Amino acid sequence: MTTTYAVLSEGLEKNYGAVHALRGLDLAVAEGAVCGVLGPNGAGKTTAVRVLTTLTAPDGGSARVAGHDVVREAASVRAAIGVTGQNSSVDGELTGRQNLRLFAKLLRFRGEAARIRADELLERFELTDAADRPARTYSGGMHRRLDLAASLLTRPRVLFLDEPTTGLDPHSRNQIWAAVRELAGRGTTVLLTTQYLEEADQLADDIVLIDRGRTAHRGTPAELKALIGSYAEVVVPQASALIPAAAVLDQLTGAEPVLDHERRTVGAVATDTTLTLPRIVRELDAAGVPLIDASLRPPTLDEVFLRLTGRGDGRTSPPLKETAA
């Protein structure tokens, strides 16, 4: 069966003076899929969104969104997409209802159509009770939901979400996640950039890891986790046992261990698929390392990112580096 791509880029390049923001970025997002684009600050995520949404022209390569070239058919691309960026587009002095009606009129909704569509979206995003309050009185999560509602006024085929939950509390983040799941269930293609690896794990059908403007790896969450094997972690009773435990894990896994003094844990990615938990326990015992607990589990996306790019993110789990005592 032939796959139809809602977003397709090949060798995408973008420079800002001497800064190479995109260095041959390749993306392929199937229609109706949720694609998570991951990377640390400066990786090129926002630049990629700006190019794909026609806000800035590429310096090389090509890209098509909803079947249209982002350079030659920019107007057609804009008619087919919705965008929610990192910065709110909401006017704080207007009410939520007024904001949506204003956006609708700017999008050339006629007559009662603007009112009807605004009311539909206010209800859909649970903003009806606050619809007639100034948006400046909204919480961060409500602002984001109003932004998302505005991006859906035209029922876009493709929705771009650029770090939509950055700075939100867990409850507000879960509300945005629920909205994205609902959109995906209705067949909307979603390209989501995020620094929160748990977010991509929860929402994305496919994940693209971007590092320094290039596509580092891509695949489903399960496929990416399978690339690096399991994650071994041990808990020791005192800080003095961390270094000896790290030496054992280093020998067993061949990967640099991660020490967390506060939690008194040592962890390392185990690429050796034959490594077992009993062997880990035996080797620690043979080395005289006291032990409270040990585990061998599938890796998180944090650990995948660290292993595949050589640097961690640490936004949703303990930082992937040695922490201070």
What residue ranges belong to the model's regions?
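C-terminal coupling/interaction segments
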Residues: 272-325
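Solvent-exposed beta-strand sheet faces enriched in polar/charged residues
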Residues: 10, 235, 260, 295-297
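Conserved NTP-handling cores and scaffolds of large molecular machines
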Residues: 107, 228, 232, 253, ...
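ABC transporter nucleotide-binding domain
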Residues: 177-271
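A short linear hydrophobic-aromatic micro-motif
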Residues: 127, 254-258, 290-295
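Preference for bulky hydrophobic residues occupying beta-strand positions
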Residues: 14, 27, 234-236, 268, ...
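ABC transporter nucleotide-binding domains
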Residues: 4-9, 14-212, 216-217
